[in-house]
Curated annotation (Swiss-Prot):
GO CC terms in record: extracellular region
Activity versus pH, per record: Optimum pH is 3.5-4.5 (determined with 100 mM NaCl). Optimum pH is 5.0 (determined with 40 mM phosphate-borate-acetate Britton-Robinson buffer).
Subcellular location: Secreted
Organism: Cryptococcus neoformans var. grubii serotype A (strain H99 / ATCC 208821 / CBS 10515 / FGSC 9487)
Disulfide bond entries: C132-C137, C357-C391
Propeptide segments, given as residue ranges: 456-489
Name recorded for this polypeptide: Major aspartyl peptidase 1
Function per UniProt: Possesses prevalent extracellular endopeptidase activity at low pH condition. Required for high-density growth in acidic environments. Broad substrate specificity with preference cleavage of the peptide substrate between hydrophobic amino acids. Cleaves substrate at P1-P1' between Phe-Leu. Positively charged amino acids are preferred at P2. Prefers hydrophobic amino acids at the P3 and P4 positions. Cleaves substrate also at P1'-P2' between Leu-Val to some degree. Required for virulence in mouse inhalation model of infection.
Coiled coil: none
PTM info: Activated by the autocatalytic cleavage of the propeptide. Cleaved at the end of the propeptide promiscuously from residue 76 to residue 79. C-terminal cleavage by autocatalysis at Gly-456 at the pH optimum indicating a possible regulatory or other function of this propeptide.
Amino acid sequence: MHYLAVALPLLTLALAAPSNSVPLTPLNSRQYSEDLAERQSWLLDQAKGLRSKYAPHLGERGQELRRRDIIDEGITRRKRANQKRATGTVSLTDVGLDASYAGQVSIGTPAQDFLVIMDSGSSDLWVAGSTCTENFCKQTYTFDTSTSSSFITSSEAFNITYGSGDADGTLGTDTVSMAGFTVSDQTFGVVTSTSANLISYPLSGLMGLAWKSIASSGATPFWQTLAASGDWDSPEMGVYLKRYRGDNTASQIETDGGQILFGGLNTSLYNGSVNYISIDESEKDYWRIPLEAMVIQGNSVSIASSSGGSNPSCAIDTGTTLIGVPSQTANRIYSQIAGAEALSASSGYEGYYQYPCDTEVTVSLQFGGMSYSISNADMNLGSFTRDTSMCTGAFFAMDMSSRSPVQWIVGASFIKNVYTAFRYNPAAIGFAELVGGSSVSAGNPSSSTTGGGTSGSNGGGSSSGAMERKGVQLGWLVGAVAVGVAAMI
């Protein structure tokens, strides 16, 4: 497997992780539900799980109860198969002032609940296992395979590499549920070791929302199984990422961080129609579409590059904070901002640029014939040098390999400004104006972009190439930049 190397420092997200002596804040659990029926259901599941685990050793009465359990499970499965659950909502938790957006996933029998980063830029599901010895594992929720009666272990190793580090463990299969939907035989990674600071409390892992072709495990992603099954009312996911950057009253962990709707779009969150840009069959790897133009401070900027041609392919990545662009493009972007300068390579922050904090930056990207603005709050990440009059920008210089199918990584700094649709069939990415927003306008035909980008539902992606695994996970890699917690130079 190949990975794109990114020479960036690992900046620690300054979250107050609990010590071993402090109990973790409980996630939603049926055991403590205010609903008596929910609590009773949890209790019955504990008994069923125990009987299942020790079935060969049960006495006569236990065997009889186990047979009843099996009948009940079959009835439940048939009922579920005959029911069409139209949509389901993943309520997002905003961690680190927009550094990561996480949803709750339930794994095993009985279910164990975890917060996992919802990442449209990768395709694997993994969670920290209870045998993990890393410090972060001791301070967050971990999956105990021994207490799940439905877990099937595998001897196959699991490894996934990001720009910020890697995670290692083994593959397993179990029942996985999210937003009211269940996949009974989902393959995922049970992680036993990670690079330092890859993730931290309250996070326990990651849910990949991209296509199967880039899954390190080779498993069909949870979302893709559901979209293909017909269980969804509409084969798409609607994404809204809430902004807490610039909110002085916000905390490091905000439970009202937006939502992902499985099975449709939340029409109450956007105005007008959705502008879909088609994805070719050969491009089902990352969620990627071609960029057609860019305007900053009222001036068109050339987006052409040696690797991406006139219309670079952009991965739309909810698991990333920054907007990664080729270094020559970053140069052009910041040359339009008076007083902007690159942070030196010797400082360890190569790729970042800073500019006067009092500068109001207007910037827009054009996809599918429409221009979408990025708010100044998302463009300006805050001050990270001893010169507090200078602020760091969201566009980050990062040259991808010539074999990479994507040249830009478009993260939450952009996605927060639009309502985003990820459509399974026909494959497409769509954008719409958020309610209360004014981020969308007709594209500018006089843009410096030249060549063959098309618009609307007929838009296509860039040419396909040899696949490379995702090599930058900037959402948590640069958590400190996203939340403004470091003074570095």
